[in-house]
Amino acid sequence: EFGVGGVGSTFRGIALTAALVILIGAGVLYGFGFSDIPDRSERLWASLFHSISAYNNAGFGLWSDSLERYHDNVLVNAVVMVLIVMGGLGWRVTSDLASQGLRRRRRRLSLHTRLVLRTTVLLVVFGALGLALTEWLNRGEVFIGMPWPERWMTALFESVTARTAGFTTVPFSLENITDSGTLLLMTLMFIGASPGGTGGGIKTTTVAALMAATRSTLRGR
């Protein structure tokens, strides 16, 4: 899809997309998410640092408790999740989606984009529901005392960040999470992000291909 002659334009597209997404994320965090930080220069540094870290799926934080102090902050959770997902999707997917939105006549998304989007949504939902089942039903310590909306937000956040980043809004450890919850998080980490994305793992497309092959085998095709 991208020839050798288009390496320069592709590189510029990747750099501009990353810069735009990171700056928007940092702007939202600075203006609203990290509003509890009184010093403006410190708030700006924290906003830029965490926006870059989230988009690149690095998971590095400025505080020893990661993002636990913002466990009930919907905006911080949402912005970090969006940055993680966008970085994990890869430029090829975001470029395809952007060009689709700019076209007057809609065309079908590429097979790669459709495969990545479907698998990503499936994994995020699977991870969130899996954590809800493994921790709530087994009375894991992580969600004790949380109101229900915060429980769902935490489960969704941990499902997103476990695959590729590493941020956390709750004190996860082997002592306060169930064995089934640990296995679920390890599975998500093993799968990771998508090809061309900023995360690691065996990639979402590999999992999608394995699932398709398994389904075909079971159907005798």
Predicted segments, located by residue:
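Membrane-proximal intracellular helices of multi-pass ion channels
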Residues: 1-221
